[in-house]
């Protein structure tokens, strides 16, 4: 291949698309788009943009306050809006972080076939854009709104009422602040939602078809857990890690009614870092419970 890429320049667009489709998002975004104009045109083909997944990049990048800056959010927004345009309405999966209401509303207006939406750690996504998602993306099957503090139980109600195909919900919260200091803004850590039972009630009343639920570090009580177990009879997986207001007895007595349940992730024991005595006392009550969940034994 010549340095200017001319040997590839004569390839039919469908062949180029086939080749480029094998690249990761990061490879595509930093490579072929800058080879020549014809390649840029091919890289914008709707066929390549039914899925927009930045999770592999975020997983490989160390958490830092830079990711929470307005400048970084603008970059993510620009990428998301561009992909929405290139998909020509065919986008079915979005997995990003640190986006805003503006970009998400833009996607909601133009991607009615969206089935998977993951926007964890997006401090400027609110109920406003999520309401648009609820009304305009009714085919939604999976939703991850973990660490999104400006999203309230109102979103859970609207999604539950308007997206009957929802099977997976991830609403995990951040754990004890000491593990995030230095990488997450302090004011954001302090604003972590406290209304666990209200959110649990919304889930139980409006998400009857849920099969997979993650609510790590929720502040829900046994009342909230009862609402979920009563209202979501199809649950197969329930993640309660870090939900320290629930005892082993609370969990066992409530999940026993879930006949399809395959796995429960219990609050577990917190293993503190050196010198973190206060946290040991807070989470140490789980040391009283060393029995393991036996789902089969709970069934009649």
UniProtKB/Swiss-Prot annotation:
Keywords: Nucleus, Ubl conjugation pathway. It is found in: Nucleus. GO terms for biological process: protein ubiquitination. It holds the Pfam family LRR_6. Pathway: Protein modification; protein ubiquitination. It comes from the Eukaryota. SUPFAM superfamilies: F-box domain, RNI-like. GO terms for cellular component: nucleus; SCF ubiquitin ligase complex. Residues 11-52 form the F-box domain. InterPro entries: F-box-like_dom_sf, Leu-rich_rpt, Leu-rich_rpt_Cys-con_subtyp, LRR_dom_sf. Component of SCF(ASK-cullin-F-box) E3 ubiquitin ligase complexes, which may mediate the ubiquitination and subsequent proteasomal degradation of target proteins. Part of a SCF (ASK-cullin-F-box) protein ligase complex. Interacts with SKP1A/ASK1 and SKP1B/ASK2. The F-box is necessary for the interaction with ASK proteins. This is F-box protein SKIP1.
């Amino acid at each position: 291949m010549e340095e200017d890429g001319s040997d590839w320049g004569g390839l039919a667009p469908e062949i180029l698309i086939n080749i480029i489709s094998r690249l990761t998002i990061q490879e595509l975004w930093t490579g072929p788009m800058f080879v020549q104009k014809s390649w840029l045109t091919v890289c914008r083909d709707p066929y390549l943009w039914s899925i927009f997944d930045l999770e592999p990049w975020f997983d490989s990048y160390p958490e830092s306050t830079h990711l929470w800056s307005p400048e970084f959010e603008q970059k993510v927004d620009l990428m998301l809006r561009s992909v929405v345009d290139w998909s020509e309405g065919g986008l079915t999966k979005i997995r990003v972080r640190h986006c805003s209401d503006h970009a998400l509303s833009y996607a909601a207006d133009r991607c009615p076939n969206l089935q998977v939406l993951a926007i964890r750690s997006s401090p400027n996504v609110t109920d406003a854009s999520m309401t648009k998602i609820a009304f305009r993306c009714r085919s939604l099957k999976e939703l991850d709104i973990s660490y999104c503090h400006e999203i309230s139980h109102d979103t859970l109600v609207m999604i539950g009422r308007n997206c009957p195909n929802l099977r997976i919900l991830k609403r995990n919260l951040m754990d004890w602040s000491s593990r995030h200091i230095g990488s997450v803004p302090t004011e954001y850590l302090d604003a972590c939602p406290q209304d666990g039972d209200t959110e649990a009630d919304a889930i139980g009343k409006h998400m009857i078809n849920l099969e997979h639920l993650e609510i790590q570090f929720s502040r829900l009580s046994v009342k909230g857990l009862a609402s979920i177990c009563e209202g979501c009879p199809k649950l197969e997986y329930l993640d309660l890690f870090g939900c320290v207001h629930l005892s082993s007895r609370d969990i066992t007595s409530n999940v026993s009614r879930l006949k399809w349940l395959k796995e429960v992730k219990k609050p577990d024991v917190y293993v503190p870092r050196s010198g973190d005595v206060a946290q040991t006392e807070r989470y140490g009550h789980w040391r009283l419970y060393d029995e393991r969940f036996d789902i089969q034994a709970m069934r009649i």
